[in-house]
């Protein structure tokens, strides 16, 4: 388990930030509580740093997603007050999903994790989150593998003497997002962290944002059969 690996590593648990998500079929108060305990058992942990509702409108709850989310969020709030989770948030939520959640919520989401990468800026969602003091986490900050073949991105990598991945991550930071790059390769993990000793010019930040569709586009969570 993750907890066992942490103990064997000698790393202080407080130095790690661990997130997991509530799966689509587990919405509702009781099922959320059971799903949380199951996750904690699998992880071998006493608490989570962040717990997220993965999807706002799963196909299973398409006709009652507001009620299902409200039940899940009540469970989240209780777990938060009990110290089992240190922060609570959502993922792939659009403004109307959060508005519906806040009709019954006592604690606002602290995080909204959404797909953000060059050419995919989700301006309306980001503006809403900033207005409501919700941290925007960017998953897939490098989009898809297509980003590494986009001429503008390779040109920027050459200009700044960095990798395309580093350009993407740096862009995300300068856009005010918290990027979540994924890798299992130690060298790439180290490289992805080496983005705090340079900055992109404002024109290059804007150019990256304008590359609409270069890595595909996010789909409407209310329409996906997921």
Provide a role label for each language-model segment.
Residues 1-16, 33, 71, 143, ...:
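N-terminal binding-site loop/beta-alpha segment at the start of enzyme catalytic domains
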Residues 15, 45-48, 85, 109:
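Local beta-strand N-terminus motif with an aromatic residue
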Residues 3-13, 40-46, 101-105, 126-132:
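Acidic (Asp/Glu)-rich catalytic clusters
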């Amino acid at each position: 388990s993750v907890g066992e690996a942490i103990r064997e590593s000698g790393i202080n648990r407080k130095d790690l930030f661990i997130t997991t998500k509530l799966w689509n079929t587990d919405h509702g108060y009781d099922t959320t509580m059971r799903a949380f305990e199951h996750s904690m058992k699998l992880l071998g942990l006493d608490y989570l740093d962040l717990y997220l509702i993965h999807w706002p409108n799963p196909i299973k709850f398409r006709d009652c997603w507001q009620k299902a989310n409200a039940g899940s969020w009540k469970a989240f709030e209780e777990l938060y007050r009990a110290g089992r989770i240190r922060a609570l948030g959502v993922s792939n939520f659009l403004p109307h999903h959060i508005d519906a959640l806040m009709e019954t919520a006592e604690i606002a989401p602290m995080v909204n994790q959404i797909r953000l990468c060059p050419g995919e800026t989700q301006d309306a969602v980001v503006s809403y989150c900033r207005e409501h003091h919700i941290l925007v986490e960017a998953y897939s900050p490098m989009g898809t593998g297509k980003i590494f073949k986009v001429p503008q991105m390779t040109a920027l990598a050459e200009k700044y003497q960095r990798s395309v991945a580093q350009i993407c991550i740096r862009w995300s930071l300068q856009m005010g997002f918290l990027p979540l790059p994924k890798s299992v390769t130690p060298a790439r993990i180290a490289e992805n962290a080496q983005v705090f000793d340079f900055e992109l010019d404002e024109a290059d930040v804007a150019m990256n944002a304008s590359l609409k569709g270069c890595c595909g586009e996010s789909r409407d969570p209310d329409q996906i059969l997921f």
